């Protein structure tokens, strides 16, 4: 698939007690490809064949007790896409895709993907891209009615509603309540606070 191995991870995707192998291949200086292998038949079998990616995450987003795979990549126009692979009739298949705001360049450097929980307890992926260390944009991916959706993507603008100055903070459970919060820096009105880098407070938001 590629000229060299970039990364290797082990995950029990089908929860049968045997781990699958997720291999990131370095195709060239600008392109990575992800393959997923299983040994359930005693011989290596490729479940996902060399799909391009920048980041990926494994989680049980549809809460069926099995693990799914979300692959973040660029489409032919360079737009960010999240591909959702899940188990269907004992086959690991691409089920659906969702648009994300961040470009692959914004994800590859300071960007992060975090597994978390929405306000109603639904599992989700929090995808944060960083633009030139100045701005951060967060997309939230979750599964509704079997489809992967980006709950922060605006139907009007086509981008996430969660865009803020970058403060080196990322989504986390900041108050220990089991729900993942998204940081949003806000400038503090104060005397002398007129420079290019004003003092800011950090507001933390939950979503559902």
Question: For each predicted feature, which ranges?
Answer:
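Beta-propeller-forming repeat regions
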Residues: 1-208
């Amino acid at each position: 698939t590629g000229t060299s191995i970039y990364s290797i991870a082990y995950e029990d995707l089908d929860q049968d007690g045997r781990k699958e192998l997720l291999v990131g291949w370095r195709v060239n200086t600008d392109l990575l490809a992800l393959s997923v292998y299983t040994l359930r038949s005693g011989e290596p079998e490729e479940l996902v064949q060399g799909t391009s990616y920048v980041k990926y995450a494994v989680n049980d987003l549809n809460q069926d007790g099995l693990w799914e795979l979300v692959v973040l990549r660029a489409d032919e126009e360079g737009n960010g896409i999240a591909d959702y692979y899940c188990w269907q009739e004992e086959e690991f298949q691409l089920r659906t895709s969702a648009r994300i705001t961040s470009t692959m360049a914004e994800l590859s450097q300071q960007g992060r993907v975090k597994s978390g929980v929405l306000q109603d307890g639904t599992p989700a992926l929090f995808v944060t891209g960083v633009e030139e260390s100045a701005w951060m944009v967060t997309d939230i991916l979750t599964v509704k009615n079997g489809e992967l959706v980006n709950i922060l993507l605006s139907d009007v603008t086509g981008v996430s509603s969660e865009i803020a100055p970058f403060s080196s903070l990322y989504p986390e459970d900041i108050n220990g309540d089991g729900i993942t919060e998204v940081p949003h820096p806000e400038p503090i009105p104060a005397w002398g606070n007129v420079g290019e880098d004003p003092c800011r407070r950090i507001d933390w938001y939950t979503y559902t």
